[in-house]
Amino acid sequence: MAVYFVTGKLGSGKTLVSVGKIQDKIVAGCKIATNLDLRLQNLPQVGRFAKTPRVLRIPDKPSISDLLAIGRGNDSYDENKNGLLVLDECGTWFNTRSWNDKERQPIIDWFLHARKLGWDIIFLVQDLSIVDKQARSALAEHVVYCRRLDRITLPFVGTLYSLITGSKMPLPKLHVGVVKYGDSQLSPTVERWLYTGKNLYNAYDTKQAFSSNYDSGVYSYLTPYLSHGRYFKPLNLGQKMKLTKIYLKKFSRVLCLAIGFASAFTYSYITQPKPEVKKVVSQTYDFDKFTIDSSQRLNLSYRYVFKDSKGKLINSDDLQKQGYSLTYIDLCTVSIKKGNSNEIVKCN
């Protein structure tokens, strides 16, 4: 059983990374209970046609009866199949006053024994220091520190960009949760949770306000298929053409620029003059009257310069271009072959 305290400043992505873990658990077929307002159909890996998610919505500040109502998260002994309980705004529960409150004691006892009921738990708090020390010692198995990378300025490059443009260098909205094993920042890092913001923003209410006067009890979310998927109608041809026109109008400048570049590249490629290939004319030589004028060898490569009866110099490279095959014997002996002809040429 794993218990996580997810901490971070306002807007650092505490809820977002928790919704990301909810999505992972739903995909794995696990049970979910949370006090977050979710939109299951907008989870990218779940979609509007999912029929199997089991997600319970519990009150903003659940009582012991609410926690008992959600039952067991996992009936097997495989902890990988544990359900996930996600609770936001837990700072008011685990401060020193609430921890010693006798009315809250049954809830705290339930959290301490949640492992036996097959639940993993994620508590969201703005800062770990507001949690009672005894609560941290008893429950804070893992602490997750959330950061937003788009709020970080790159050394030197970011400063140079700001001086030139007068604005902060834009970075991708990547939310990172650094998971520590223990309640100290010096504790060892066991993993990192990485989630991009855009694909999860629509999956939960980012402006949800939590209240002690929540008027509903525990209830189950409808599966995305029942709430949205069964009402989905495929687009007809006219609707598809309309969407195509909208997207073409939206990206017309970029599209025209891309077409212009592609056309220019195609035209330059077609009209580019083809290089002339020089044809090497094969000649017939009287190798009986050839002698090796000079030769050299470097590792496995060799080169000869021959002299004919008239004193004309011919190198081995020219002979090979004309289709002659040269076989090295030694620096003063070489075999020249072409077709059925095979001649031995030596030094003078």
From Swiss-Prot:
It is found in: Host membrane. InterPro entries: P-loop_NTPase (IPR027417), Zot_N (IPR008900). This is Gene 1 protein. The chain crosses the membrane at residues 254-270. Keywords: ATP-binding, Formylation, Host membrane, Membrane, Nucleotide-binding, Transmembrane, Transmembrane helix, Viral extrusion, Viral release from host cell. Isoform G1P plays an essential role in phage assembly. It is required to increase the number of adhesion zones between the inner and outer membranes of the host cell. The extrusion of neo-synthesized phages occurs at these adhesion sites. May be involved with G4P in creating zone through which the phage assembled and extruded. GO terms for biological process: viral extrusion. Its main location: host cell. One of its GO terms (molecular function) is ATP binding. ATP binds at G8, K9, L10, G11, S12, G13, K14, T15. It comes from Enterobacteria phage M13 (Bacteriophage M13). GO terms for cellular component: host cell membrane; membrane. It is a single-pass membrane protein. Belongs to the inovirus G1P protein family. The lineage of its organism: Viruses, Monodnaviria, Loebvirae, Hofneiviricota, Faserviricetes. Interacts with G4P; this interaction results in a complex that spans the inner an outer host membranes. The gene is I.
